[in-house]
Amino acid sequence: YPPKPETPGSNASPEDWASYQAAVRHYVNLITRQRYGXXSSPEEAVAWLLFKADPSQDIEPRLDDDNAW
């Protein structure tokens, strides 16, 4: 990951704060950018990101348990 932007001091100018906010936006965009593998479907990528699921496993929810709720 890229380095986090440094927070300006408490007595920083409005221009410094605007520059910091732009740097934070850029940083967040970089670290949250979607990265899919060449053979991955978006569903597999989301399952991996959310659950660290094995892409070889079925990603559909299992509804075979009658006592789920």
Swiss-Prot record:
InterPro entries: Pancreatic_hormone-like (IPR001955), Pancreatic_hormone-like_CS (IPR020392). Pfam families: Hormone_3. GO terms for molecular function: neuropeptide hormone activity; neuropeptide Y receptor binding. GO terms for biological process: feeding behavior; neuropeptide signaling pathway. Coiled coil: none annotated. One of its GO terms (cellular component) is extracellular space. The keyword Cell inner membrane does not apply. SMART domains: PAH. The keyword Nucleus does not apply. Belongs to the NPY family. X's at positions 38 to 39 were included by homology with other pancreatic hormone type precursor sequence. This is Pancreatic propolypeptide YG. It comes from Lophius americanus. The lineage of its organism: Eukaryota, Metazoa, Chordata, Craniata, Vertebrata.
